[in-house]
Amino acid sequence: MRTRLIGNKLFAMTLVVLFVILASTIAGQAAEWKPTKPIQFVVPYAPGGGSDVLARSMIAAIGSEKLCPVPFVVVNQGGGSGLIGTTTAAQAKGNDHMLLTFISGQVAAALAAKGAPTFRDLTLLAGLAIDEELIVVKTDSPFKTIEDVVKAAKQRPGTITIGGTATGQEDQMCNRLFERAADLKFRYVPFNSGGECITAVLGGHVEMIWANPSEFVPQWEAKMVRPIVVAKEKRMTELPDVPTFKEKGNNVTFEMFRGVGAPPGISPEVAAFYENMLKRMAQSAAWNTGYLKKYMLSPTWRGSKEFTQFVAQNEPVFKGILTELGLIK
């Protein structure tokens, strides 16, 4: 009897050990998915803008840290306020070899266009950073301060030109917040990217632009442009001489997020590979020095679940501003 009990116990223990080994093997195999061909990195804006800089900086950091076994190919699909490129990713269901830069403006664009794919039609992988919104002028502009802009706008309502990336996105939403706070009216001029905005202000085609640091840092370092105000609670450490709107009596703040998405329908193993890759990238010196510090962004890691929730929370805020702009009926 005793021998039989011992035998039963050994048999049961053997089954448990085999089950653990089998489960570990299956889990290991699931976690071992890796891309096998070049990854298309869709940027839904023209070259030279903030999203383009984001994608190329990510690729450089990932390459520096050897986090991906295959190369990336940047595919710029500007137009439609970011909707053309976003639609490309949304329609590539189950494509394991495609990523998409995903920012606040793509949420807004989807709200303003009926039937357009929303963030719910994508797999959001990670939120990586918060970018700042500033008003930037050409170095020799007569607008030395934001007070100069306000004074001129009151004298010439609806005629002061201010450029920004696309219609109904972060730049135009910030512009509306400024108009509302200061009781002003500008003539907003949309462009396909931050790079085009810089070209326009340098060429005198618009009097000022809304821009992120990643879009104007090279020209600022070359003393070609000047930021005059930032839509932030406190001054930027990197630009201590640039005041906030709030300091000047206008309650204008805006947090522009930058992140990464993928097509819908990818497997949990594929999503886990990319999320882990991005997390390791976000911890690297190559990323923190080569992108965040260089272009003056704030690090804000959010994993897939948290980033998706964060985007959902911002959606009704954007909807309210777009309704004011008459872009949502």
Kindly label every feature range from the protein language model.
Residues 1-12:
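N-terminal secretory signal peptides that target proteins for export/translocation
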Residues 12-25:
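Bacterial N-terminal signal peptides
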Residues 30-121, 159, 183-208, 219, ...:
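N-terminal (or domain-start) structured segment
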Residues 36, 180, 184, 266-329:
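An extracytoplasmic/periplasmic, membrane-proximal ligand-sensing/linker region
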Residues 39, 48, 55, 74, ...:
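Residue-level signal for nonpolar/aromatic packing positions in well-ordered secondary structure
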Residues 64, 88-98, 110-196, 245-247, ...:
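Hinge/capping helix and adjacent helix->loop/strand transition within the periplasmic-binding protein
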Residues 78, 159, 163-167, 171-242:
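Ligand-binding pocket segment of bilobal, Venus flytrap-like solute-binding proteins
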Residues 103-104, 139, 213-214, 232-233, ...:
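Short secondary-structure boundary segments
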